[in-house]
Amino acid sequence: MYKFVVFAAALAYANAGLIGAPAVAAYSAAPAVSSAYIHQAAPVAVAHAAPLAVAHAPVAVAHAAPYAIHAPAVGASHQSVVRSLGGNQAVSHYSKAVDSAFSSVRKFDTRVTNDALAVAHAPVVSTYAHAAPVVSTYAHAAPVVSSYAAHAPVAAYAAHAPVATYAAHAPVATYAAHAPVVATRTSAVAYSPAAVVSHASFSGLGASYAW
C-alpha cells in the first residue's frame, strides 16, 4: 500500500514540474530520480508506574485483663406475724432489701387473714327522701305610726301691768301779762292714786278665758 502511495506522489511531482514550466522552455532529459520518504512518528513509550505496594498490617487486639471490683451486696429481710386473741385473725408483714454498688431493690408484702370472718353481701337499700314542701309565708309590715308632739299651750299669759299712776304736767296756774300787778294765789292740783288693774287671757283646748 505504501508503495502505491509513493508512486502516486512521484507521478504527481513529475506532472507538477511539467505543467508549471512555460511552453517555450526546453528541457533536457534528466535521469529518472525516484525518492521515497516515509515519516513515522516515534512510538509512544507508555511507562506504567510500579504497582502500589499495599501492606496490610495485622490488627493487633489487646484484651486487657478484667478489672475486678470488690462490691459486696448487702441483703436484709424482716418478717412479723400479729395474731388476735383467739387466733382467728392474723396480720403478717414481710420485707426484703438488697443493696449493691449498682442497684437497690425493696420488696414489701402485707397479708391479712381471718378464718372466722364470714363475708355476707349487704342488700342494697335505696332510700328516697322527698324534699320538704316549699311553704311561702308573707309577713305584713307593721303600719307606720306617726306621732307628733306639739308644744303644750301656754297656760297663763302675764301681760305687763299698766302704769298705776299717771302724772300729767300741771297746767300753768297763773298767766302774767303786762298788766298791773295783781296779787294772786295759786292752788296745787292733787290727784289720788288709781287702782291697780290686771288683765289675763287664755285660749286653748277649745276654751277661751279672759279677765
From Swiss-Prot:
Start and stop residues of the Sequence repeats: 29-32, 41-44, 128-137, 131-134, 138-147, 141-144, 148-156, 157-165, 166-174, 175-183
InterPro entries in the record: Cuticle_C1 (IPR022727)
UniProt tissue specificity: Restricted to sternal, tergal, legs and wing anlagen epidermis, and soft cuticle secreting epidermis, such as intersegmental membranes and pleura. No expression in muscles or fat body.
Pfam families in the record: Cuticle_3 (PF11018)
Keywords assigned: Cuticle, Repeat, Signal
Signal peptide region: 1-16
Induction data: By juvenile hormone.
Region span, 4 X 9 AA tandem repeat of Y-A-A-H-A-P-V-[VA]-[AT]: 148-183
MF term (GO), any: structural constituent of cuticle
Region (2 X 10 AA tandem repeat of Y-A-H-A-A-P-V-V-S-[ST]): 128-147
Domain notes: The tetrapeptide (A-A-P-[AV]) repeats found throughout the protein are also present in many proteins constituting the protective envelope of other species.
Function: Component of the hard and soft cuticles of the larva and pupa of Tenebrio molitor.
Protein name: Larval/pupal cuticle protein H1C
Gene designation: LPCP-22
